[in-house]
C-alpha cells in the first residue's frame, strides 16, 4: 500500500484547498469541529476530512503538519474518521499566546475522550504517525520527523475491518487559518508487537 492523493476522498469538502502530489493545503472555515457529547454536551461533526480507504490490518501513516493557527481551538492533524460517532484524531489545538494543547481525541460509540499536554504556543509544525494493528491503534508525534513519541494507544470498536484514515483541519470558533500537510507516507507498521507479557488466552 502506498499513499496516493488520487485515492483520497473528502468528507465535507472545504471551500478553499489545494492538492498536489506532495502537498495539501486547507483553509479552514469558522465554526468547524469534531466532537461528540462528553463534557461540552454538544455534537459537532462538520470538519473537513480527507482520507483514503484500506483493509490493510498492519501499517503506519506519517505526515508533517505546518499551521498558522492563532485562535482558540484552531487545529490540524491526522485522523481516522469512520462515522460521526466513531473516530480518532491527533493534533495541536491552539489555546492562547502562551501555550497550546498537543493531544488526541478518541470517540467510540458517540462519546469523545480528549487527552492533552501543554506545549509552547510558538511551535508551528508537528509530525504525526498513525499506526494500526488490527483494531488497535497508536498515534505518535515528532518535532523532527525522526524521533517519535507516543501520544495515545486505543481500541476502536468499529475499527476492525475496512477503515478510512488521513488528515483534517478545522476552526471550532470564529477563526480561519491555513494548514499545510507534506511528507505523507505509508510504511510497514512501525508500532511493533509487544515483546513482554504474553496475551491472555481467550
Which sequence ranges carry the predicted segments?
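Extracellular glycan-recognition regions
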Residues: 1-202
Amino acid at each position: 500500500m502506498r499513499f496516493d492523493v488520487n485515492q483520497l476522498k473528502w468528507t465535507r469538502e472545504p471551500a478553499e484547498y489545494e492538492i498536489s502530489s506532495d502537498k495539501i493545503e486547507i483553509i479552514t472555515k469558522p465554526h468547524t469541529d469534531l466532537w461528540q457529547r462528553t463534557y461540552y454536551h454538544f455534537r459537532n461533526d462538520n470538519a473537513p476530512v480527507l482520507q483514503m480507504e484500506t483493509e490493510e490490518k498492519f501499517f503506519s501513516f506519517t505526515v508533517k503538519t505546518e499551521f498558522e493557527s492563532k485562535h482558540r481551538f484552531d487545529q490540524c492533524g491526522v485522523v481516522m474518521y469512520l462515522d460521526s460517532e466513531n473516530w480518532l484524531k491527533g493534533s495541536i489545538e491552539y489555546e492562547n499566546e502562551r501555550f497550546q494543547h498537543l493531544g488526541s481525541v478518541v470517540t467510540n460509540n458517540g462519546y469523545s475522550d480528549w487527552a492533552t499536554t501543554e506545549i509552547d504556543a510558538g511551535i508551528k509544525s508537528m509530525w504525526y504517525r498513525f499506526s494500526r494493528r488490527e483494531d488497535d491503534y497508536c498515534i505518535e508525534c515528532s518535532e523532527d520527523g525522526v524521533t517519535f513519541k507516543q501520544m495515545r494507544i486505543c481500541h476502536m470498536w468499529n475499527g476492525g475491518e475496512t477503515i478510512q484514515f488521513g488528515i483534517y483541519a478545522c476552526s471550532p470558533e470564529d477563526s480561519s487559518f491555513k494548514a499545510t500537510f507534506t511528507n505523507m507516507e505509508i510504511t510497514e507498521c512501525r508500532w511493533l508487537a509487544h515483546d513482554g507479557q504474553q496475551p491472555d488466552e481467550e
